[in-house]
Amino acid sequence: TCSIPYEYSNGKLKRTLYYSNGVYANSFTENN
């Protein structure tokens, strides 16, 4: 199961996907 924590980076909402073991699966910035 992957968790999707949300963090603010430079005033933009950054979503990073983590594996259950805590390894980075994919990192990108939300751009709506």
Curated annotation (Swiss-Prot):
One of the entry's Gene Ontology molecular-function terms is: toxin activity
Q: In which tissues is it expressed?
A: Expressed by the venom gland.
CC terms in the record's Gene Ontology section: extracellular region
Does Secreted appear among the keywords? yes
Q: Which UniProt keywords apply?
A: Secreted, Toxin
Q: Where in the cell is it found?
A: Secreted
Supply the name of the protein. Answer: Hainantoxin F8-35.23
Q: Which organism is it from?
A: Cyriopagopus hainanus (Chinese bird spider)
